[in-house]
């Protein structure tokens, strides 16, 4: 047993003390149990490693341990909602994001806005991830009211071949935040052995959201990224650029050609660099 003023560390041999294994519901491969009062959080051996995009595994134990300590020592919870009902990415495909949020003491819920009739009062943030269909007028108004009441929104556009006409309400929410949807898919002509022209590794802007990623040389990888720009007539929100392409990229506006696996820059397309993500912040807050 080892300890300091904050933490006591006790190691048990589960073969010699099987009752402890049953009491703490440990995994046979090995488990670290964090306990504070009546609150417990288990981190198994398998949870300490995470696969990267190249198929290798890297150690995430420090992150998992930090989350576990936070889970058992903090009584403060933050509630966030993921919008459903418009073909958004299902929660079953967002297990890593959900796990990380819950590890940071967030309570994650799904929200069918048309059914509920409002964004819940305890919503500290609303996520809209990859919707295939537009919101209706009533839902749009509810979200705008939520934003006007200091709500926070994370919106990631999906791909729709009719995006120029199919998303007027989503476009209006972005316009309120000072961002314009240019209805074009980012193309990076310079191919590599790792990525095709539709796969973008963007450059970072200057904002607290992305500064740490830039400082630690962590890459963001995007596919079917949508070109955005500043909405010049927005008055309440100030957009700050987070992600952009190289100068060689362009925005393909002929989505029918793109669906047929063909693309060629012409006068109707948008010249790079393209802006791919913004943080819209209220000027008065």
Region roles according to the model:
Residues 90-285:
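Acidic, S/T/G-rich, low-cysteine, solvent-exposed domains in lumenal/extracellular/periplasmic regions
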Residues 1-133, 137-140, 144, 158:
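Juxtamembrane extramembrane loops of integral membrane proteins
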């Amino acid at each position: 047993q080892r300890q300091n003023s904050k933490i006591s560390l006790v190691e048990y041999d589960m073969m010699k003390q099987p009752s402890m294994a049953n009491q703490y519901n440990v995994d046979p491969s090995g488990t670290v149990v964090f306990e504070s009062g009546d609150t417990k959080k288990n981190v198994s051996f398998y949870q300490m490693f995470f696969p990267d995009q190249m198929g290798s595994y890297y150690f995430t134990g420090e992150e998992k341990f930090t989350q576990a300590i936070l889970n058992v020592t903090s009584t403060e919870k933050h509630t966030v909602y993921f919008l459903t009902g418009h073909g958004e990415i299902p929660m079953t495909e967002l297990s890593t994001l959900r796990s990380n949020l819950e590890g940071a003491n967030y309570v994650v819920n799904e929200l069918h806005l048309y059914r509920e009739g409002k964004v819940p009062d305890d919503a500290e943030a609303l996520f809209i991830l990859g919707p295939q269909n537009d919101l209706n007028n009533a839902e749009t108004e509810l979200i705008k009211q939520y934003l006007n009441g200091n709500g926070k929104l994370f919106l990631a556009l999906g791909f729709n071949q009719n995006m120029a006409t199919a998303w007027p309400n989503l476009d209006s929410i972005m316009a309120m935040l000072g961002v314009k949807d240019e209805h074009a898919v980012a193309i990076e002509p310079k191919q590599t052995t790792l990525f095709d022209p539709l796969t973008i590794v963007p450059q970072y802007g200057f904002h607290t959201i992305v500064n740490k990623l830039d400082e630690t040389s962590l890459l963001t990888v995007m596919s079917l990224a949508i070109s955005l720009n500043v909405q010049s007539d927005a008055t309440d929100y100030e957009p700050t650029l987070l992600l952009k392409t190289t100068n060689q990229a362009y925005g393909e506006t002929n989505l029918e050609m793109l669906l047929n696996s063909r693309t060629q820059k012409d006068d109707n397309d948008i010249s790079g660099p393209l802006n791919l993500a913004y943080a819209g912040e209220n000027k008065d807050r």
